[in-house]
UniProtKB/Swiss-Prot annotation:
Its EC number is 3.1.-.-, 2.7.-.-. PROSITE patterns: DM10, NDPK_LIKE. Component of sperm flagellar doublet microtubules. Component of the gamma-tubulin ring complex. It comes from Bos taurus (Bovine). Expressed in trachea multiciliated cells. InterPro entries: DM10_dom, NDK-like_dom, NDK-like_dom_sf, NDPK7, NDPk7A, NDPk7B, Nucleoside_diP_kinase. The lineage of its organism: Eukaryota, Metazoa, Chordata, Craniata, Vertebrata. This is Nucleoside diphosphate kinase homolog 7.
Length: 377
C-alpha cells in the first residue's frame, strides 16, 4: 500500500463558541489511515498528520458529515484534481425504494445492499399521498395499469433510501432483477424481485433507469429545498417506544441484521428514519443522562459521529419489553447474562453498544416525538 497517497477535501466545521463556520483542508492517507488538517483562512496546520481509526475511504464523498476528534465536518468539495479524478469519477447516488409488499423484508434487502458495497446515505419510512404517487409514476401516465400502480404504492408504508457506490444506478438495477417477479425467478433467481416479489406490480422494490431519473426521483422523496417530503409513518401512541441504531453500527453495516433481529422477536417497526445529528441535538436528547451517567460525554460524541437510524417500536408494554430485548448497556455483561439480546449480539463497548432504547415508560412517546416530529420537521 502506498503510504504517501493522499486524498484532499475542503471541509467546514461550525464553531458553536464563535457562531461561525470554519473551513479546513482535510487530508486522508489511506495507506495508514492517518489524517491531517489545515486552516484555510489562516494558512496554518490545524492538525498534524496523525492516525485516526474512525475514518474510512468509503466515508469520503461530497456532502457527507465526518467526525474528526469530536469535530463534525461537512465535506464540501474535492481539494485537488487527483482526489476528484480518483474518488469522483464513478461515484453515483441512486434511489432504492422498498415497496409496501416487502417492507417486512427491509432487513434482508438492506443486508443485500450493504454486501454489494453500497453506502446508505439517506433512509425514511413514509406514506405517499395520491398526488405524490402520481408524480412518482409520471413516466407511466399513459399506461393502462397506472391506477393499479398508484393504488399499490399508496396501500401501505414504503422505505425510500439514497444509496451510493460506483455505477450505483446499473448495480442497483442488477440487484433488483427483471421488473416481473415471475420472470426474475427464472432469469435472476438470486435477485431481490425474485426473492421477495410476487408479480409485475407487487415486485418488492424499485430503482430508477438512469442517473437523470434517479436525480428526479430523489428530489421527490428527499427534497433539496429543505422541506421534509412525504410524511413519516410514526403513530405516536401510548404503545410506542424509541430505538436508535447508533452510528458505529450503521457504519459497520449492521442495520439490516438488527432490523431482522427486531422483527423476528415480534416487534413492529412502525416508523424509521436516518438522521445526521449535531452535538446540540444530541445533548438535548440525552439531557436526562447528564450528571447521572459517567460516560455521558462519550455517549454524546458517539451519537453525532455519523448517521444514526431512529425507529418507533410498537408492542404491548413496549418500553419495558423492548428494553429487556436490548439487554444491559455493557455488551460484555450482556453476553454473559443475556446472550440473545441486541447489545450482546451487535455491541462492542458500553458506548458503542449498537442501540439506544427508551429507559423509562413515560419517555417512550417523548423520544419518538423528538425524532419524528421535531427533527423531521
Amino acid at each position: 500500500m502506498n503510504h504517501s497517497e493522499r486524498f484532499v477535501f475542503i471541509a467546514e466545521w461550525f464553531d458553536p463558541n464563535a457562531s461561525l463556520f470554519r473551513r479546513y483542508e482535510l487530508l486522508f492517507y489511506p495507506g495508514d489511515g492517518s489524517v491531517e488538517m489545515h486552516d484555510v483562512k489562516n494558512h496554518r496546520t490545524f492538525l498534524k498528520r496523525t492516525k485516526y481509526e474512525d475514518l474510512h475511504l468509503e466515508d469520503l464523498f461530497i456532502g457527507n458529515k465526518v467526525n474528526i476528534f469530536s469535530r463534525q465536518l461537512v465535506l464540501l468539495d474535492y481539494g485537488d484534481q487527483y482526489t476528484a479524478r480518483q474518488l469522483g469519477s464513478k461515484k453515483e447516488k441512486t434511489l432504492a425504494l422498498i415497496k409496501p409488499d416487502a417492507v417486512s423484508k427491509a432487513g434482508e434487502i438492506i443486508e443485500i445492499i450493504n454486501k454489494a458495497g453500497f453506502t446508505l446515505t439517506k433512509l425514511k419510512m413514509m406514506t405517499l399521498s395520491r398526488k405524490e404517487a402520481t408524480d412518482f409514476h409520471i413516466d407511466h401516465q399513459s399506461r393502462p395499469f397506472l391506477n393499479e400502480l398508484i393504488q399499490f404504492i399508496t396501500s401501505g408504508p414504503i422505505i425510500a433510501m439514497e444509496i451510493l457506490r460506483d455505477d450505483a444506478v446499473c448495480e442497483w438495477k442488477r440487484l433488483l432483477g427483471p421488473a416481473n417477479s415471475g420472470l426474475a425467478r427464472t432469469d435472476a433467481p438470486e435477485s431481490i424481485r425474485a426473492l421477495f416479489g410476487t408479480d409485475g406490480i407487487k415486485n418488492a422494490a424499485h430503482g430508477p433507469d438512469s442517473f437523470a431519473c434517479a436525480a428526479r426521483e430523489m428530489e421527490l422523496f428527499f427534497p433539496s429545498s429543505g422541506v421534509c417530503g412525504p410524511a413519516n409513518t410514526a403513530k405516536f401512541t401510548n404503545c410506542t417506544t424509541c430505538c436508535i441504531v447508533k452510528p458505529h453500527a450503521v457504519s459497520e453495516g449492521l442495520l439490516g441484521k438488527i432490523l431482522m433481529t427486531i422483527r423476528d422477536a415480534g416487534f413492529e417497526i412502525s416508523a424509521m428514519q436516518m438522521f445526521n445529528m449535531d452535538r446540540i441535538n444530541v445533548e438535548e436528547f440525552y439531557e436526562v443522562y447528564k450528571g447521572v451517567v459517567s460516560e455521558y460525554n462519550e455517549m454524546v460524541t458517539e451519537m453525532y459521529s455519523g448517521p444514526c437510524v431512529a425507529m418507533e417500536i410498537q408492542q404491548t408494554n413496549p418500553t419495558m419489553t423492548f428494553r429487556e430485548f436490548c439487554g444491559p448497556a455493557d455488551p460484555e455483561i450482556a453476553r454473559h447474562l443475556r446472550p440473545g439480546t441486541l447489545r450482546a449480539i451487535f455491541g462492542k463497548t458500553k458506548i458503542q453498544n449498537a442501540v439506544h432504547c427508551t429507559d423509562l415508560p413515560e419517555d417512550g412517546l417523548l423520544e419518538v416525538q423528538y425524532f419524528f416530529k421535531i427533527l423531521d420537521n
